[in-house]
Each structure stands twice: as C-alpha cells, then as structure tokens.
C-alpha cells in the first residue's frame, strides 16, 4: 500500500512539474513512480513534445532501477528505446561537427554498457536501416560477434578498423586472421603490410603460420 501511495505522489509531482514547464523534474518523478506511470503514454508524451532530454532521463532512470533477472522484458524494452534515441541523435547531427562526434560517442558508450540488454537482431536492423555501419561493427564486436564485425568492416573498406580488431581483440582466432588478412591486403596493401611485420601478429600466429600466410598472400597477388 505504501508503494502505491509513493507512486501516486510521484505522479502528482510529475504532473505539477509539467504544468510548471519543468520536463526534467517531471521525468525524474515519472521514473520514481515506476509502473504507476504507464510507460508508453509517458514516453510518447515526452517524444511528441520534442523533449528528448527528459525522455532520455526517464528511460535511463527506469533502466537503472530495473532488475534484468526479474524484469528481462522491461529491460530490453527500455534499452531498445534508448538505443533508438541515441541513433536519432546521431542521424540528426550534422556530419563532421562536434555534436555528431558526441552523439556517436554517447551511442557507443551506451552500447558498451548495455549491449547484453539489447535485442541483437533488432539493434542490427536499426543500425543497418540508418547505414550506421561503423557503429554496427562496434556493436557486433562488443556483443562477441567479432568475426562478423571484421567481415562487415572489410565490406565497407575499413581496413584500419579490421587491423585494430585483429590487434586488440583476444577472441580473434589464428584461423580468422589467416582468412581475413588476404582480403585486407587486396583493399589496403600498405597498412596490411605494416601489420604483417608487427610483433603482435607474430605473437598471435607464430613464425610458421606467418610464413604460410605471407606465401598465401603472395600467391594471391601473382594469380591476379
């Protein structure tokens, strides 16, 4: 009973804050009200009025308070709303501006912190729809789909991103490296050549495998 009273009190304070023109306070009170505030109506209310900062505060507060073990569907829904909001900010910012850089940084920080709460297929489709392929590669790598991330980067010609992943990610297998580097070499032979001479690659593959890989690349060049 006490929780219902608390929820009702927060709802009244949220409505008072909206009437006073303070959407941020309203968002905080709606979040504190929990399920006493109908989620869809509350979120859409902020969205329809263009109050994105208040919407983000409401969603983040609800997500922080939710228990992934007991409320997995709620957590997934909140995370989906938030990633969609982050994507909207990225797409709404002018390319090359500080605002665009900050929006991209915020999106990737959110993905890094909450990837396990996101629906992988839905998030992949969202990022593909808006052609945010670099962010999609980042998401896939964060979610553990490292080879898929590397293949995507190869497709979009991001050899620097491919080599960075091969260098830094311990989940990349020697087999993956041997399959990926010939493709990377065809796209950017200079950067790939530098990587082939790196100590990192020697440590990951070993001398014998590295010699075999270089031979494979050389044969590929001669056969073209």
Predicted features and spans:
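Extended alpha-helical solenoid/arm regions of large eukaryotic scaffolding proteins
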Residues: 1-224
């Amino acid at each position: 009973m006490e929780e219902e009273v608390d929820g009702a009190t927060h709802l009244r304070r949220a409505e008072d804050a909206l009437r006073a023109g303070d959407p941020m306070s309203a968002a905080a009170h709606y979040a504190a009200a929990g399920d006493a505030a109908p989620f869809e109506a509350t979120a859409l209310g902020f969205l329809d009025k263009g109050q994105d900062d208040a919407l983000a505060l409401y969603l983040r507060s609800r997500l922080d308070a939710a228990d992934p073990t007991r409320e997995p569907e709620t957590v997934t829904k909140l995370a989906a709303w938030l990633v969609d909001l982050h994507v909207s900010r990225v797409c709404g910012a002018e390319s090359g501006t500080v605002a665009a850089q900050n929006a991209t940084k915020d999106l990737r920080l959110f993905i890094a912190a909450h990837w396990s709460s996101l629906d992988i297929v839905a998030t992949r489709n969202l990022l593909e729809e808006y052609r945010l392929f670099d962010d999609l590669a980042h998401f896939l790598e964060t979610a553990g789909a490292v080879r898929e991330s590397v293949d995507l980067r190869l497709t979009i010609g991001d050899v620097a991103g491919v080599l960075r992943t091969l260098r830094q990610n311990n989940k990349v297998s020697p087999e993956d490296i041997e399959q990926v580097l010939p493709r990377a070499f065809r796209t950017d032979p200079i950067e790939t050549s530098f990587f082939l001479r790196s100590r990192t690659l020697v440590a990951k593959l070993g001398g014998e495998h590295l010699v075999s890989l270089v031979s494979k690349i050389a044969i590929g060049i001669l056969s073209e």
